[in-house]
């Protein structure tokens, strides 16, 4: 039986590339080998069971955050177009171990966001936006979404097992 929490999305198929069935992938993983090293992977249509595939080759497009992958059995542009929007997934237990202050994207989404010494609930983490400085998107309890720099000075404590993180925002940050 399919269990959603046993799989982790590492990318999304966003477009075909060329006429031979190659696929453009928008990654949501910081591990390039997931897109470049040949081997077993899975693709998944929303709310369906993942389907095992074989990645035959992959490369990063220079200057862009897009990978081009070749998958066994997808050899025409039309067959590539059929799976646009599908996710590239891996079993969650195949995640690499991280050092003390590193976190998997999947583990941060859904965490309670708490504030200050009282650790009062202020909202929930809804996204992590990658960039020069990563940003946590937090939906506040009143429904407004705010972006918080994901740095130790502002997010000093993260308790993955207890499903919360602490935010000490500078004055005015949550009012923007």
UniProtKB/Swiss-Prot annotation:
Under SUPFAM superfamilies, the record lists:
PRC-barrel domain (SSF50346), Translation proteins (SSF50447)
User: What protein name does the entry list?
Assistant: Ribosome maturation factor RimM
Q: What is known of its domains?
A: The PRC barrel domain binds ribosomal protein uS19.
Q: Provide an example Pfam family for this protein.
A: PRC_RimM
Q: How does it assemble?
A: Binds ribosomal protein uS19.
Q: Could you tell me where this protein is found in the cell?
A: Cytoplasm
Q: Which organism is it from?
A: Prochlorococcus marinus (strain NATL2A)
One annotated GO biological process: rRNA processing
Tell me a GO cellular component: ribosome
- Give the matching InterPro entries: PRC_barrel-like_sf, PRC_RimM, RimM, RimM_N, RimM_N_sf, Transl_B-barrel_sf
Record flagged with keyword Transmembrane helix: no
State whether keyword Cytoplasm applies: yes
Q: Which NCBIfam families match?
A: 16S_RimM (TIGR02273)
Q: What does this gene product do?
A: An accessory protein needed during the final step in the assembly of 30S ribosomal subunit, possibly for assembly of the head region. Essential for efficient processing of 16S rRNA. May be needed both before and after RbfA during the maturation of 16S rRNA. It has affinity for free ribosomal 30S subunits but not for 70S ribosomes.
Keyword field: Chaperone, Cytoplasm, Ribosome biogenesis, rRNA processing
The record's family statement is:
Belongs to the RimM family.
Stretches of the chain forming a coiled coil according to its record: none
Listed GO molecular functions? ribosome binding
What PANTHER family has UniProt attached to this entry? RIBOSOME MATURATION FACTOR RIMM
| Domain PRC barrel, chain residue ranges per copy | 100-173
